[in-house]
Each structure stands twice: as C-alpha cells, then as structure tokens.
Amino acid sequence: MAVDSNLSSPLGPPACEKDAKALRFIEEMTRNADTVQENLLAEILARNADTEYLRRFNLCGATDRDTFKTKIPVITYEDLQPEIQRIADGDRSPILSAHPISEFLTSSGTSAGERKLMPTIKEELDRRQLLYSLLMPVMNLYVPGLDKGKGMYFLFVKSETKTPGGLPARPVLTSYYKSEHFRSRPYDPYNVYTSPNEAILCPDSFQSMYTQMLCGLLDRLSVLRVGAVFASGLLRAIRFLQLHWSRFAHDIELGCLDSEITDPSIRQCMSGILKPDPVLAEFIRRECKSDNWEKIITRIWPNTKYLDVIVTGAMAQYIPTLEYYSGGLPMACTMYASSECYFGLNLNPMSKPSEVSYTIMPNMAYFEFIPLGGTKAVELVDVNIGKEYELVVTTYAGLCRYRVGDILRVTGFHNSAPQFHFVRRKNVLLSIDSDKTDESELQKAVENASSILHEECGSRVAEYTSYADTSTIPGHYVLYWELLVRDGARQPSHETLTRCCLGMEESLNSVYRQSRVADNSVGPLEIRVVRNGTFEELMDYAISRGASINQYKVPRCVNFTPIVELLDSRVVSAHFSPSLPHWTPERRRR
C-alpha cells in the first residue's frame, strides 16, 4: 500500500497509512509532553472537582499544577483504602471519580495480604486500547513482513470475583481480554493470533494452555512471533509442551481433540480447525522425544523472528533459559503498564533486554516523579538523565498523586518525553511470576513456620535468607535456614520441615497463593537446612569483599552466584511443601 508522504514520521518509514498516523500521534504527544500533561491534569481536576476526595482538600475548583501539588498529598494505597472499601461495599456517590467506577482491577501488589483494588472507569478501556494500537506500528519499523503470518501468544484469563457491592474485581488483562475491545477486535493483518478467543477466554488454565499450544503446533509455519505477557509464562508453555507432546501428536495424527478438553466452546471451535495430519504428528514426535531441547522454538516454529515477552525487572532472571530454548532470538519488551495505569511503550523494541527503555506517553495520566531519597516530586519533563525516581500518578479514575511503587531510571528523552529503564518494584524481595513478596511478609512467614518448629521439637530458626530459584519450571522460593536446636532437643524430622514449608506458604499473600493454586506459575516452596556456622561464613565472605563488620546485616534475599553456591555447599537437607496452600478468589473482609 502506498503511504501518504504527509503522514511520514521521524521514527522511520511506516509500513502503511494506519501506521503512519500512529507514529505521528506518538511524535505529537512526545513533542508537546508538558502541554499535554498540563491540559490533562486540568481536565481530570475539572471533571472530578465535586468528588468527595478533592473537596476534602479544599481545591475549590482549581485546575493548575501549583495549587494541586500544594493542597493534594502524595499517598499510598493504605491512605486510600477506606474510600476504596466504601466503593467496593456499594457506595455509588462520587467519592474518587465523577464517572461511575465500573470495576476494580486487582493489582499484583498486596495490602494486608490481599490484592490491592484499583478503581477504574469504562473509558479507561479506550485509553488502554489506544496504547495497544501504537505497539505494532513501532514494531513494524524494525521487523518487516509481520502481516504475512501470525503471532503465537499464550494469553489467559484469571479468576475474578465481585465485591460486596457487586463490582467485578479482576486482573487488568482479564478485564481487557473479556472486553468487546478484544473479543470483537477488527481484523488486522499485523495482529493475527494462532490462539482462538475461545481458548484464551477459557477459565480452566489446563484446557486453555492445551488448546493454545495445539493451535500453535497446527499453524507452526505461519508463526512469526512467539510471546506471553511475562517471560515466566512463555517458559511454562515450553514446559507444558515437554510434558504433553505425545498427546498433541496423538490429537494431530487422528484429528481428534483430547477427551480432557471438555469446554464446549473450545470443542466446537476446534472441530473446524483440527484435521488428521500424520506428517505433522511424526514431526512433533521426532523433535520432542529428544532430551536436547536447545533451540526448540526455532526447530518447531522455524519462521519465528522474535519473542514478545517482558524480560525487565524480576523477569530478567529468565533471559538465559529463553535464549537456550529460542537459540538466541531477540526479545521484545513492547510496553510498560500496571493495574493503576498504562504508562508508555518501547520505541526501540529490538534493543537488548538490559537496554530496554520505555517512553512515557503523556496522554495516559498525569505523571510525577519523586527522586530516590528525596521527597519533592518533579514534573515529567523535568527529570534528569541518570537519576532514579519513584513513579506517582493521577488518573481519570480518581487516583490522585498515588505512589505506584516502581523505581525507574531516566535513560534519555524522545522529543520532550523522558525514557525510563525499569529498575525494580519498591520493597519487593522475591518474585517468580506476578507474585511479589516483601521483607515484612517473608519475615512473618518465617516466624509462623518457626513456631511450628518450636511446637513440634523445641527448635527455632536462628537465621535465614531466601532465593528465587528459576532453574526449575515453574520457579519456586527457596529458604535457607540455620536452626537453633537446644541441648537435649530432638532434630526436626523431614515431616516437620515439610509442614514448615506449607506453613510459610499459608502465611504468604493471596497473589502468591493464587500463583501456586490456580495459575501453576510458582512451584512448591523449598526449605534448605544449612549446617551451623553457615551464616557466619556468609558474613566473613561479605566482609572480605569490603562490607563493614559494624554495619553488616544478613541479606534476606540473595542472587549473587558465589553466595548461592556457598549456601548450597552447606546444605544438609532439603524439604518441599507437601501440598497446595489454601486459596479462593474471595477476598477476606477487613
């Protein structure tokens, strides 16, 4: 298709006229970032002027930035929790937003062990869809020909519930996949998936994964990109193929869907897709029966050009494994988003994972940034390259000066919009998938498990640290325990220590427990008991590397390979959680 030269973009030559318009929109927003931000805040404040929250701080209809920042405090979820609970309980008065709260998006972050509830309004779907619509126009600048094939993406809906007041409470991606924006999306040759909607929307994770993988195998030569939301999700899909390849080959050979797939909509959908193909079945058997799974992605899907997965932050730990399975394919991190707000996109999606930077789109929300170690928030356009900041957002849905908890480092600017490298989540100690465990949660879990130990054999945990082990699929938490066994007390049995593992899991937050029970994205927690004196050796090692003996504290999480190796060399026994912890979609009442 010929592209109107008036629609060209400084980002590069667009693939089509639709792309050209999207790229020009990015240019317009980023060139005028400060004006866009000023106008956006004024619009939010004018719209929500009569809400209970803004009236509480006597804003009196003011819409300028100075008055806003003088009168409205920077807050955390706990500050807003009473208002959110009232909305959840059914209060429909304009508490936070002049527009009705349509649902709650459940964050992977937690408060008092439960997922945080982020209020949202219907029009936010349009805003999120707008950001999605910018991703492929940017990708097409770097990878040509994506309209000639399909994407094999492993996408899933998760458990949802309703609040006491009847509002849905569900993860942001579940909300999006169930929306008309996704289910009735118009045909776009640059955005065709191998997975049918029926498989993506199936609430049974096994049936959904099975069907999506089967469709990807049937369409293997059409696949040009392979992806999931997180790197860990793509690795679970590969592990699923390792476990079930013989069943896939059987289905493909006979053209019959496995009897364990009982979802009626899936069975009806697959009846028009699955036909006998003995040649493909034999190919799958030949490739998958080998113990060598190196480059398995490009062996089965030979036309794959890149992986579309998040490999920044905690997901960076999966990069070596993905490189092994893909043969070193590029990994594209395309966008930066959360339950609170969608933030921006990667304008150089083929960059190395360690160099990924996201450009903040100033039309998504009003953004402020608190310098690390500081207190005064600065504007979007006033951040400094090389500095680290905590992200603060004000949204149309009623979050005002809300601390998201993400730590970002400024790497540069695109026009006047800053570009950020995601550094970490504030206070997060352990993470395998969407789970996030902080130090206080881990400490509480260890204390509860230590009580089990004391009750059963009189022992206690003398010292501990932890490690997110991603060498297994799925990954799992490892706790290194040094025990204090009193004179005359018996050594704890294997059964006691496995109960300690389960006791810890029961003490962790609901996102962790959902990951274990419903999503199968985290494996059983492991306790590795180390011999006495190990943590003194750990301190000696740290001091030998320059740590101050007066200021040394035992790290509650380790990831430096020599330290992990030191701990593993001192392990005297290992124990795993014997069963799944308790979890239901229902939220605990506070």
From Swiss-Prot:
It is an enzyme of class 6 (ligase). Pfam families: GH3 (PF03321), GH3_C (PF23572), GH3_M (PF23571). One of its GO terms (biological process) is response to auxin. Induction: By auxin. InterPro entries: GH3 (IPR004993), GH3_C (IPR055378), GH3_M (IPR055377). It comes from the Eukaryota. Its EC number is 6.3.2.-. GO terms for molecular function: ligase activity. Keywords: Ligase. Catalyzes the synthesis of indole-3-acetic acid (IAA)-amino acid conjugates, providing a mechanism for the plant to cope with the presence of excess auxin. Belongs to the IAA-amido conjugating enzyme family. This is Probable indole-3-acetic acid-amido synthetase GH3.1. It comes from Arabidopsis thaliana. The lineage of its organism: Eukaryota, Viridiplantae, Streptophyta, Embryophyta, Tracheophyta.
